[in-house]
Amino acid sequence: MEKHSGFVRFITRGSLVGQILVGLVLGIALASFSQSGAIAAGLLGTLFVSALKAVAPVLVFILVAASIANHRQGQKTNMRPIVLLYLLGTFAAALVAVVVSFAFPSQLALVSHTNDITPPGGIVEVLQSLLMNVVDNPFHALASGNFIGILAWAIGLGVALRHASDTTKRVVGDLSYGVTFIVRVVIRFAPLGIFGLVSSTLAETGFDALWGYAHLLMVLIGAMLLVALVLNPLIVFWKIRRNPYPLVFTCLRESGLTAFFTRSSAANIPVNMELCKKLGLNEDTYAVSIPLGATINMAGAAITITVLTLAAAHTLEISVDLPTALLLSLVAAVCACGASGVAGGSLLLIPLACSLFGISSDIAMQVVAVGFIIGVLQDSCETALNSSTDVLFTATACVAAEESTGDSAAELG
């Protein structure tokens, strides 16, 4: 009985990363020894993707509305430079992801037919489609998975509810918690879903699919390394006009390393607070900027959304021009700012970006499933970049402000 309880505890409370790794290995093993069994196991993957597809629209709608409705005003802190750095870093990371994706295009193993796709003719058609999706009926948007329409209605409802009573705001917040709990339950089935997806994909397409995922993972991690070691130091140097690398490496070592294993920006907040204190930063500033950064500073998420979306477009042979790629960078940056509240991280926001290219929700959720397969490393690297950048930009803004007023600057490393 104790063994049974221990097994149940491992399933419900054990490391999701470890369970996904087990599912990944078992899926490969099943595909190697039994093609028919692997294809049959694909039902588990189909159910998992369908569950994600069902819950994602409701999650985005409730989460965004609750976040805006419960936003607090009147916080008196010198936050503008830090917020600007957060937004600049996230958008610039999306641009880096676009460049890397064009330089090293990735192919995904998707079960789809290109003939079913109606790609946009260019930026004008994309913008026209975008505007039409914005004014979609909210119920139709939820039912059809029109994430742009869902966002528009969620923002509108959230702004309206900011003037509601505290009781109403609490109800909306409770709804957000309830939906997030359901998503967490769905995510707990990720190992089974990954097992089915990997086994059926390998059985139907062969082991070449693994190389496709390996290439995609290399593109993702390569873009994140470029941002961490090149782009972010350039931004820091632009602000403080001195060698940025002591601070960059300190943040990566003391914040990024723990975030890599916790895979949670929120869980890494105490680590970042302690690092800010160690660096001698203004407590009134970092007490606000670090929790805020865990919510809106999402360079890693912007990279994930951009790379996977462009990989899907490349796989479906959809031509992407430069203006559309720039629009994707902007959309990815905006989506990334909301990724922290999503239990699946940035992956569940990929369908929104995919909709820019006329990619159906069915195929977009297959891309999300690919993200879960590579998520063991992708999510860890993404969180490490996101969380370490919170401290990096907070320290940068504090040092720049202190130097502009002639005060003694904080210790950089």
Curated annotation (Swiss-Prot):
Gene3D superfamilies according to UniProt: Sodium:dicarboxylate symporter (1.10.3860.10)
Membrane-topology annotation of the record: Multi-pass membrane protein
TM regions (residue ranges): 14-34, 44-64, 82-102, 141-161, 178-198, 217-237, 290-310, 330-350, 356-376
InterPro entries: Na-dicarboxylate_symporter, Na:dicarbo_symporter_sf, Ser_Thr_transp_SstT
Molecular functions (GO terms): neutral L-amino acid:sodium symporter activity
UniProt feature coiled coil, ranges: none
UniProt keyword annotation of Cell membrane present: yes
Keywords noted in UniProt: Amino-acid transport, Cell inner membrane, Cell membrane, Membrane, Symport, Transmembrane, Transmembrane helix, Transport
Catalytic activity: L-serine(in) + Na(+)(in) = L-serine(out) + Na(+)(out); L-threonine(in) + Na(+)(in) = L-threonine(out) + Na(+)(out)
Subcellular location: Cell inner membrane
Keyword Ribonucleoprotein: no
GO BP term, example: serine transport
This protein's GO CC annotations: plasma membrane
UniProt family annotation: Belongs to the dicarboxylate/amino acid:cation symporter (DAACS) (TC 2.A.23) family.
Function in brief: Involved in the import of serine and threonine into the cell, with the concomitant import of sodium (symport system).
HAMAP family attached to this UniProt entry: Ser_Thr_transp_SstT
Stated name of the protein: Serine/threonine transporter SstT
Organism: Edwardsiella ictaluri (strain 93-146)
Gene responsible for this protein: sstT
